[in-house]
Amino acid sequence: MLTRRRFLGYSALSPALLASRPLLRSGFAMPPASSSQAPLRIAIIGSVYHLGSNLQSIADRFLVGYPYAGNWHMPNVQVVSLYVDSLAPKFAGPIAWGRRLEAARHPQGKRNSGQGPATQPIELGPPHPPIAQSVRRRPGALGLGIQLPEKFGPMTDLSGVRSREFGFRLCRNIPEALRAGGERLAVDAVIVVAEQGDYPTNSKGQALLPSYDFFQQCVQVFEEERRGVPYFNYKQLSFSFPEAQQMVNTAERLHFPLLAGSSFPVASRLPDVDIPRGTHVEEAVMVGAGGFDGSDFDALEAMQSMLERRKGGETGVKAVQLLEGDDVWQAGREGRYSRELLSSALSRSDTPMGLTLLDGRNQDLVASGVLPQLVKNPAAYCIEYADSTRATLLMLNGAIMDFNISARVAGKELVSTQFFIPPTPNETNTACLADKIEQTFMTRKTPYPVERTLLTSGMLEACLESRHRLNQRVETPQLGVKYQPPAESQYTRT
C-alpha cells in the first residue's frame, strides 16, 4: 500500500520507475561474480555514526579490519559511499524517507532523541554535505596523526572524519549511495544499520526504525538495474512483522542474498557448547539485562539460534506472553518456567550482583530468594512453540549484566552457556558478525537462514503487543515460520 510516508520515502527515486509495473522475476539478472583480486565495493547506510554507535561498531570493521581467529583480518572490500540518516536535514533535496514526519501521531515520543523535534521541517542546504570542519591533529597510540573535530565527544558525528580518512563519498540519499554519485548501481554489497537515532515510537513502545524504508529504496534501485547485490540488515528486519515478511519475500523473488540479525548468535560461548542438532528440547530459560525493544531482541535471537536446532527444525511460534513485576516471580512458583533451568543459566553469569559485589561471596540467586530484592522491574518473555517446546527469556536488571541460557534436552543433562559479549569499545562479538557479513558478500550465500531473524522480529513484536494489552497471552498464527538450521553451528569457536 502506498502511504504518504512511503511516497515521501521514494520521492528521491525516478518518477518513471515509480510508475512502472513490477519487473518479472525471470527477467531479474544475477550479477557476475566478483574477481577474487578486486575488492568488493560497499555502500553503508545507517542512522547515526557516533562514537560507540551500532553503525560505528559495524562500519569500522570494514574500514580498518577486525580481530578474528587469532589474527588481524582486513576484508577485501572498499567502502565507496555512506548515507547517514541523522544528517539528512542538513542536506539538499527531499528527505530520504518519511516516517519521521509521523512523530506527532505517537504520544510516546522519541527514543534516543536528539536536539530538535521529530517533526522539524527539512531545510535545504548546499548541494553537497557540509563536511569541512575545524580539525586538529591528535597523536595516536603509535604516534600516528588522526584527524578529529575540534569538539570531539560521544555524540560527535564521525561521517566527515571517516570520509576524509578513507576517501568514500557522503551521500544525500540512499539511491545516491548505491550509485556512488553516478547514474548506475555501482556497489557490490550493502550494509544497513538502522539502529538508534531520532525516531518516534508507537503506543507499544517500539521505535519506528526505518529498516524497511531503507530496504525498499535499495530494492527500487535493484529493480531499475534488473540486478541485486548481497544485503545485510543489522538486528531486526522491521518493527512490523508484515514488513519483515515482505523483505524476505522480496529478496527471494529478486534472487539476492539477505542476511540479518544480531551479533549475539555468532559470538563466542563460554563454554563452547550447542544443542545437538536433531535432539528433542523440552524447555529453555534465557537470562539477560536490558530494556524493551532493545537488547531483548539480541537475547531472543541468541536463544532462537540454539532452539532452532531441535528435532524437526523450526516450525514456528503459536503464542507469547510478556509478564512484568511480581507476575514474573509468580510464574516461576507456578512452574511456567523451570527454576532449575533459571539457576543453571544464572550459574554461567560472570556478572552476579548482590552480595558478590558487597563482600565477594558467591551465592545461588535462585535458592537464596534474593532475586526479587535485586531485580525491581523483572520481565519474562514467555514463548510457546508450535511443537510444544517452551522457552522463557528473563530480563533481570540488577541481578546480572550478561546473557546466559540453559536448556533441558531429552535424554541428556542440561545444556548451558554464556553468550560472550565483551564491553565497549572492543566488542569482539561484532567482529564475529562482520566475518559472517563478509562471507555472505564474497560467496553470495548466507551462512544461516534469514528466517531466524524474521521469526525473532515477529516474536518481539508479539511480546510488545502482549505488554500493550496489559500482559495478556497473545496467539500468533502469523508466526508459523518454518526453516531448517545450518548443518554446522555458526558461532565463533576460534
What are these regions, as identified by a protein language model?
Residues 161-189, 193-199, 214:
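A structured beta-alpha segment of the ubiquitous adenosine-cofactor-binding alpha/beta core
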Residues 288, 298-424, 431-451, 460-463, ...:
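Contiguous beta-strand/loop segments that form the cofactor/metal-binding neighborhood of enzyme cores
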Residues 195-265:
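Beta-strand-loop-alpha-helix segment that lines the small-molecule cofactor/substrate pocket
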Residues 39-41, 77-79, 185-189, 226-229, ...:
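Loop/turn elements at helix/coil->beta-strand transitions in domains of secreted/extracellular proteins
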Residues 29-107, 123-163, 284:
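N-terminal Rossmann-like dinucleotide-binding module
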Residues 44, 188-192, 233:
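Redox-cofactor binding/interface segments in oxidoreductases and associated redox assembly factors
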Residues 42, 257-269, 277-292, 314-326, ...:
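NAD(P)-dependent dehydrogenases' Rossmann-like dinucleotide-binding region
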Residues 1-15:
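N-terminal secretory signal peptides and thylakoid transit peptides that target proteins
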